[in-house]
Amino acid sequence: MSTVSDPNSSNPPESAGNIRPEPIFREINAEQTDEIVEVESACMNCFETGVTRLLPTKIPFFREVVLMSFKCDHCGHINNEMQSASEIQKSGIRIELRVQSVADLNRRVVRSDNSSISIPEIELEIPVQSQKGEVTTVEGIIERTIAGLSQDQEKRRIDHPETAASIEKYIERLHRLKEVTTPFQVLLEDISGNSFIENPLAPAADPQLKTSYFTRSQQQNEQLGLYEQNHEEQHLLKPIAEDSWPIENLHGEVLQFPTNCPSCQAPCETNMKLTNIPHFKEVVIMATVCGACGHKTNEVKSGGGVEAQGVRFRVQIASREDLTRDVLKSETCSMSIPELDLEVGPHALCGRFTTVEGLLVAMRDQLDGTLFHDSADDATKQQMQRFLDTFEDVMNLKRVITLVLEDPAGNTYVQSLSDDDSEPDDKLTVERYDRSYEDNEDLGLNDMKTEGYEEKA
């Protein structure tokens, strides 16, 4: 095994006693030296010895992956694939793409081994773990299907001519699919939650792309190697008495628990504290500082349950004072700026206690590191740069905007600049609304039985 590195690099070789200066998984950057690992491996075509090159990297706006490229100098066989190196997500992901033009075929697709793909219009279904994970495009998925069906067609025409003719007709349907004479749908479902389809309109919402999350079944968890513990087994930890830790004592207590750094995966400590937000409710504030790479995160989670109604805040931002409002954004809250056609989903930014300016800075920083900065498409890069310039004008108060925060769980709060109820805040509008069926489905409330649950359904 060998590591390909820059011979002119002045960095000393890494030893066992040295702390790694940078995380293993880094975003692709032309100015950084790629740490490519080469491994000798057997060629599956001629069974001679070839070379596999491994590159651990981080896809912006997505997760950590290992890119693998195999080449055999004996027969010329080449194979490329991608393995997910990130943790299995809490929920599975389901992505629906409506392909309406040839340009949609160029959308990037990141799919793991645990993903399945289907195109209902032609009754195509690629089951889970039938193909290796890869970074490809919508057209690449169709091309790979055509290549797979075309294998052994010559032999099949001799041995089973009827089957070969049927497959040939299906291959012709796949070729016609690439012409996009009629719209069709691509459904991508990944039980590990580690798949992704590009949104070329980002940061604006894409009307052709719909993303939803689902809770895995026990069978799907076992398929990923996740097994539930038998709660009937004897536990090593002794149970805590009901009144051992009164809630009043937790308000002045900073609790710590071990975790891993989300940037470099090094072990670190997370501090957690229960606190009260004036004029609102009880929340849990968590902060993590990594001693290895210096990465800092903070997150806020609601200390209460789901409210009876959802809440929608509209904040007009026109002065420096408007940027200083305190904001408690829960993890179920989505944000939008109608003037910029910008929408940020609830999972893009975690729950946090900050200010309006802090929210805008977090949105800008996340957009500034998106997938489009290393894109070969100059038009896409210019489009993103123009949007970032416009966003900078908003930060400098050169444009008046309205920030909309919508939380179906009702656990988000925006500070009012007026303490007198008789003089309402003209720049802040608060609206309570009844949740839709889809909102309750996302919150897991439709399957929750709160009355008569002791009775058999």
UniProtKB/Swiss-Prot annotation:
GO terms for cellular component: cytoplasm; nucleus. A zinc finger (C4-type) spans 43-75, 261-293. Disruption phenotype: RNAi-mediated knockdown in tracheal cells results in defective gas-filling lumen in terminal branches. Residues 425-438, 448-457 have a biased composition (Basic and acidic residues). This is Zinc finger protein ZPR1. Residues 1-13 have a biased composition (Polar residues). It comes from the Eukaryota. Might mediate EGFR and FGFR signal transduction cascades required for lumen formation in tracheal cells. GO terms for biological process: cellular response to epidermal growth factor stimulus; epidermal growth factor receptor signaling pathway; fibroblast growth factor receptor signaling pathway; lumen formation, open tracheal system; pre-mRNA catabolic process; protein folding; terminal branching, open tracheal system. Keywords: Metal-binding, Repeat, Zinc, Zinc-finger. Pfam families: jr-ZPR1, Zn_ribbon_ZPR1. SMART domains: Zpr1.
